[in-house]
Curated annotation (Swiss-Prot):
<keyword id="KW-0472">Membrane</keyword>
<keyword id="KW-1133">Transmembrane helix</keyword>
<dbReference type="GO" id="GO:0043953">
    <property type="term" value="P:protein transport by the Tat complex"/>
</dbReference>
<keyword id="KW-0813">Transport</keyword>
<dbReference type="GO" id="GO:0008320">
    <property type="term" value="F:protein transmembrane transporter activity"/>
</dbReference>
<feature type="transmembrane region" description="Helical">
    <location>
        <begin position="1"/>
        <end position="21"/>
    </location>
</feature>
<keyword id="KW-0811">Translocation</keyword>
<keyword id="KW-0653">Protein transport</keyword>
<comment type="function">
    <text>Part of the twin-arginine translocation (Tat) system that transports large folded proteins containing a characteristic twin-arginine motif in their signal peptide across membranes. Together with TatC, TatB is part of a receptor directly interacting with Tat signal peptides. TatB may form an oligomeric binding site that transiently accommodates folded Tat precursor proteins before their translocation.</text>
</comment>
<dbReference type="InterPro" id="IPR003369">
    <property type="entry name" value="TatA/B/E"/>
</dbReference>
<dbReference type="Pfam" id="PF02416">
    <property type="entry name" value="TatA_B_E"/>
</dbReference>
<feature type="compositionally biased region" description="Basic and acidic residues">
    <location>
        <begin position="170"/>
        <end position="180"/>
    </location>
</feature>
<dbReference type="GO" id="GO:0033281">
    <property type="term" value="C:TAT protein transport complex"/>
</dbReference>
<keyword id="KW-0812">Transmembrane</keyword>
<feature type="compositionally biased region" description="Low complexity">
    <location>
        <begin position="103"/>
        <end position="123"/>
    </location>
</feature>
<comment type="similarity">
    <text>Belongs to the TatB family.</text>
</comment>
<keyword id="KW-1003">Cell membrane</keyword>
């Protein structure tokens, strides 16, 4: 613990024998032993309390994770699945009611109205004119289907045909050059 070797302990014993004297040395050693015992007991008590606190913290963590698993498992029960499906169906039915046209007010309340009421203009049904962003997006989508390499197509130039028949002879000469 203190990294004291046998030779160092012997030196301390000799110095204590000379400084304290042979008469009082056993009482001093007994007192030092008692202090060491008290220090060890306090250290072990502290260590025990610390380990107990760690066990309690681990138990609290285990209980918390167990409760989370229990809550998750209750959501997977058949009745829990059916209730969530029922909620989804109810939401879908509520959305269907949005598409229905608004019913007109009763005839009694419609009679006092005059032509002074201005109806809201109808929204146009024509699509919006194309924007620059639309063309950029279209070009980006077209680029996906194009090949990765840039390929240049070469079209052969038409050869002028002379009246004297020199063009067929030149074509045969090119064929011979390609063959070799």
């Amino acid at each position: 613990m203190f990294d004291i070797g046998w030779s160092e302990l012997l030196v301390i014993g000799v110095v204590a024998l000379i400084a304290i004297g042979p008469k009082e040395l056993p009482g001093v050693l007994r007192m030092v032993g008692q202090w060491m015992g008290k220090a060890r007991r306090m250290a072990s008590e502290f260590q025990g309390q610390f380990q107990e606190a760690m066990r309690e913290a681990e138990m609290a963590d285990l209980k918390k994770s167990f409760d989370e698993v229990k809550e998750a498992a209750s959501g997977f029960s058949p009745s829990g699945m059916m209730s969530s499906l029922q909620r989804d169906v109810d939401k879908a039915l509520d959305i269907e009611g949005v598409d229905k046209p608004v019913e007109s007010q009763p005839a009694a309340s419609a009679a006092p109205e005059t032509s002074a009421t201005v109806e809201a203009p109808a929204t146009p049904t024509t699509p919006e004119p194309p924007r620059v962003e639309t063309f950029v997006e279209a070009d980006a989508h077209q680029a996906v289907g194009e090949p990765l390499a840039i390929v240049r197509e070469i079209k052969p130039e038409p050869q002028p045909q002379s009246l004297d028949g020199a063009a067929p002879a030149e074509a045969e000469r090119l064929k011979d050059a390609k063959a070799s």
